[in-house]
Amino acid sequence: MASNPEERNSDKQKALDNAISQIEKAFGKGAIMKLKQNPVEKIDTISTGSIALDSALGVGGLPKGRIIEIFGPESSGKTTLALHVIAEAQKKGGSCAFIDAEHALDVLYARKLGVSTDDLVISQPDTGEQALHIVEYLVCSGAVDVIVIDSVAALTPRAEIEGDMGDQHMGLQARLLSHGLRKLTSAVSKANCILIFINQIRMKIGVVYGNPETTTGGNALKFYTSVRLDIRKVGVIKDKENITGNETRVKVVKNKVAPPFREAKFDIMYNEGISKLGEIIDMGAKLGVLEKAGAYYSYNNTRLGQGRENVKTYLKTNKEVANEIETKIRDLLRNHDNSIIIDEDSEQLLEESVF
């Protein structure tokens, strides 16, 4: 028997190496390894289409090989955000799929957001089981970069569809998702694919204190997701009397790849999607790329206009200036690990969650 610590450590190391060798023989090379043999690389991401949200996520976008949940009230921009992710993936040459469980995808609107619908794989499954089987085939193919499921609430179990209208089916959907996610999690990681679940909000009955809101599909999705995004409409954008868009806020309520509880605010314009020009103005002013004096904005000692909407009009007609400002903003974010902007609301949310 070894008498000193060094000999005991040597024996333990030999035993560990022997165990690793046996595991590799049983399950194949790469089934187990030390981290120094496979050093951690920078997380590969796909942009959300929003500079502010990419910054709030801390890694420059949605991480590949992970499961993502986007949830919020009706007409808050959930599908719009998911379509922007698809458009960004396609710009990089990626393949994408849209599982339209709600049977409500607006193809014309998707095109306006920059989605190449000719290259988009679309499925409209009849049951929740069929939807998850289709997702499993797509993920295991290794050929798809982004898969969007719209929505969790529409993943109706076969037993519920085949039953009578008034039948009670307690927990069927939650069990379906729990079983499906157990199978999909490792496959998504191996395929380096992003699997996005769009989810709806429901109200808990009888909640007096605390938040009565909850998401559909049980608790399994909350555990298996690496990133959860809470998207809300916080205001409207008007052009004189007409409403032309929504002011939108996204909270990163869960993040396994960077610090959570950050926020991003941006505009979603009708028939246009996320307003990149609005983000350029807001983030440019925050980062000091644009100079703001009262309601006036300036860039390189050149006055761009008075008021945010007038500056957006100027940048729309002067795309070279807009591209130059955007490049400077992204360079600043990249040099600070994409995570230098946390507004006061995010700091307060972080403090509440910690303390």
Swiss-Prot record:
InterPro entries: AAA+_ATPase (IPR003593), DNA_recomb/repair_RecA (IPR013765), DNA_recomb/repair_RecA_CS (IPR020584), P-loop_NTPase (IPR027417), RecA-like_C (IPR049261), RecA-like_N (IPR049428), RecA_ATP-bd (IPR020588), RecA_C_sf (IPR023400). Can catalyze the hydrolysis of ATP in the presence of single-stranded DNA, the ATP-dependent uptake of single-stranded DNA by duplex DNA, and the ATP-dependent hybridization of homologous single-stranded DNAs. It interacts with LexA causing its activation and leading to its autocatalytic cleavage. Gene3D superfamilies: P-loop containing nucleotide triphosphate hydrolases. One of its GO terms (molecular function) is ATP binding. Transmembrane segments: none annotated. This is Protein RecA. Pfam families: RecA, RecA_C.
